[in-house]
UniProtKB/Swiss-Prot annotation:
Pathway stated in the Swiss-Prot or TrEMBL entry: Polyol metabolism; myo-inositol biosynthesis; myo-inositol from D-glucose 6-phosphate: step 1/2
Known function: Key enzyme in myo-inositol biosynthesis pathway that catalyzes the conversion of glucose 6-phosphate to 1-myo-inositol 1-phosphate in a NAD-dependent manner. Rate-limiting enzyme in the synthesis of all inositol-containing compounds.
Cellular component terms (Gene Ontology): cytoplasm
Cofactors that this protein relies on: NAD(+)
Enzyme class name: isomerase
Organism: Candida glabrata (strain ATCC 2001 / BCRC 20586 / JCM 3761 / NBRC 0622 / NRRL Y-65 / CBS 138) (Yeast)
Protein family membership: Belongs to the myo-inositol 1-phosphate synthase family.
Protein name: Inositol-3-phosphate synthase
Reaction catalysed by this enzyme: D-glucose 6-phosphate = 1D-myo-inositol 3-phosphate
Gene behind the chain: INO1
Binding site for NAD(+): 74-77, 150, 186-187, 197-198, 200, 247-250, 298-299, 323, 326, 357-359, 372, 412-413, 441-442
The entry's keywords: Cytoplasm, Inositol biosynthesis, Isomerase, Lipid biosynthesis, Lipid metabolism, NAD, Phospholipid biosynthesis, Phospholipid metabolism
Length: 538
């Protein structure tokens, strides 16, 4: 099956595990796990291996064009995203300040577009790698049709220029392609973002025509307005699928209130009653779910209240969140895991950031910063819990974790991150690791947006059924979609949303392994391991 630049992968000796029927891939897979029971003082462990049999079906027809609607289209991430798609689609080469000749456009930083996956070993035992997106058909970002909403009405060439993320030569070449694109009017409830954003809010759909001021009444009408925007965009561009992603300002946390947002019915009623704890992100998420369009939350606020998750469950609509994991936190999810897995005991992590883009400007408000602080702090929780030797009631079961974010206009999109990891070693020794990291914030976030959209679209084409006790070839029963919360996407998210009752996995290597093994099983390959018996056994 050829899915990437002429690459063809054929898996031999899979028997009846994998079959192709017209435009469908059917895979029979036995999932192996271990159920562990332990006594109260955790000195005795009883392990029971458990097998479950599933059949997966992949629709091999990826969309020729995929609709992408960004909330916050006119921001740094949104304008950079549109620019990246156009530059790659039209092969816009450009000059940079630090390189001779022309630079070709690329999708560096994107796991789906610029990374590889281990296929196996060759006859000499050497690892063989192929592009990540070559195992199964995935949509090409060049085929994205991009639109969206923003509370600021600047055209996209103006938004790109204001962001000043890209090289000047590239901006000049892309401006003619972007000047006719303007964000749709968005929802603006001032209480949810920093007051300093009011000066930008000139493109709002919730403006009272009599006073010319924004109003927070009529929230059900605002929801229906967004639903109509989605339908219109889909129809005008002849699209089969549209994915909505929030890359707008960080909102404050909403209160979880009984009778307001604790159930689907209460949430919808609260929207109709203009309840004060209904945020703009709630409006966009609910509209997307009701239109059966996947919705991804790229900011740290708690958009997915219990009522919204229930709404997604009832509508069988995919959702994912929260908060892009792009720089400092991604490194933290690797380094903290490494230290704890090595038997080293981190006792404090101090994380400092300053940045000068509008994200930093909005986060200078305490309520919005609190949302970000919660998101960034949770990344080490499951890592600590994985090692009761290092973290327990006697030694302490927490890490002192301090997070600081400051706005400094002068540095623009170049976010500066400084971290110090202070750890205990054997026999009273200590270790201190200090990291200074400077990066273009939006050029790290935009590839994540691309990956989230590509993988969400792919997951929407995968269904499964439980076939325990059945012959795979003669299996019966309806195929189902994934559970609506796409925890497979946790690799790209700071505070991964999970199925209620389950803990998130934050370790980056674990998250990547899950993605790789899922793609491998679909084409009949076993889960990857590093046993390497070819060299270790006689």
């Amino acid at each position: 099956m050829t899915v990437n630049k002429g690459i063809s992968i054929r898996v031999n000796n899979v028997g009846d595990k994998v079959s192709y029927k017209e435009n469908e891939l059917l895979t029979n897979y036995t999932y192996h796990t271990n159920v562990v029971h332990t006594n109260s003082d955790k000195t005795q462990f009883e392990v029971t291996p458990l097998d479950k049999n599933y059949q997966f079906k992949v629709d091999l027809n990826k969309p020729e064009r995929l609709g992408v609607m960004l909330v916050g289209l006119g921001g740094n991430n949104g304008s950079t995203m549109m620019a990246a798609v156009l530059a790659n689609k039209h092969n816009v080469c450009f000059r940079t300040r630090d390189k001779e000749g022309l630079t070709e456009p690329n999708y560096y930083g994107s796991l789906t577009q610029s990374s590889t996956i281990k296929l196996g070993v060759d006859s000499k035992g050497k690892d063989v790698y192929v592009p990540f997106n070559s195992l199964v058909p995935m949509v090409n970002p060049n085929d994205f049709v991009v639109s969206g909403w923003d509370i600021n009405g600047a055209t996209m060439d103006q938004a790109m220029e204001r962001a000043s993320v890209l090289e000047v030569d590239l901006r000049n070449k892309l401006a003619p392609m972007m000047k006719d694109h303007k964000p749709l009017k968005s929802v603006y409830y001032p209480d949810f973002i920093a007051a300093n954003q009011d000066e930008r809010a000139d493109n709002c759909l919730n403006v009272d025509p009599q006073t010319g001021k924004v109003t927070t009444t009529g929230k059900w009408e605002h929801l229906n307005h967004i639903r109509n925007d989605i339908r219109t965009f889909k129809q005008q561009n002849d699209l089969d699928k549209v994915i909505i992603l929030w890359t707008a300002n960080t909102e404050r946390y909403v209160e979880i209130l009984p009778g307001v947002n604790d159930t689907m019915e209460n949430l919808l009623e609260a929207i109709k009653n203009d309840h004060t704890e209904i945020a703009p992100s709630t409006i966009f998420a609910a509209a997307s779910i009701l239109e059966h369009c996947p919705y991804i939350n790229g900011s740290p606020q708690n958009t997915f209240v219990p009522g919204l998750i229930e709404l997604a469950e009832k509508n069988d609509s995919l959702i994912a969140g929260d908060d892009f994991k792009s720089g400092q936190t991604k490194m933290k999810s690797v380094l903290a895991q490494f230290l704890v897995d090595a038997g080293i005991r981190p006792v404090s992590i101090a994380s400092y950031n300053h940045l000068g883009n509008n994200d930093g400007y909005n986060l200078s408000s305490p309520q919005q910063f609190r949302s970000k602080e919660i998101s960034k702090a949770s990344v080490v929780d499951d890592i600590i819990e994985s090692n009761p030797i290092l973290y327990n009631d006697k030694l302490g079961n927490k890490i002192d974790h301090c997070i600081v974010i400051k706005y400094m206009h002068a540095v623009g999109d170049s976010k500066v991150a400084m971290d110090e990891y202070y750890s205990e070693l054997m026999l009273g020794g200590h270790n201190r690791i200090s990291i200074h990291n400077v990066c273009e914030d939006s050029l790290l976030a935009t590839p994540l947006i691309i990956d989230l959209i590509v993988m969400t679209e792919f997951c929407s084409r995968v269904t499964y059924r439980n076939v325990d006790g059945q012959d795979g070839a003669e299996a019966k029963g309806d195929f189902e979609n994934f559970y609506p919360v796409l925890s497979f996407l946790s690799y790209w998210l700071k505070a991964p949303l999970t199925k209620p009752g389950y803990q998130p996995i934050n370790g980056l290597n674990k998250q990547r392994t899950a993605l790789e093994n899922f793609l491998r099983l679909l084409i009949g390959l076993p889960a990857i391991d590093e046993l390497r018996f070819e060299e270790r056994l006689k």
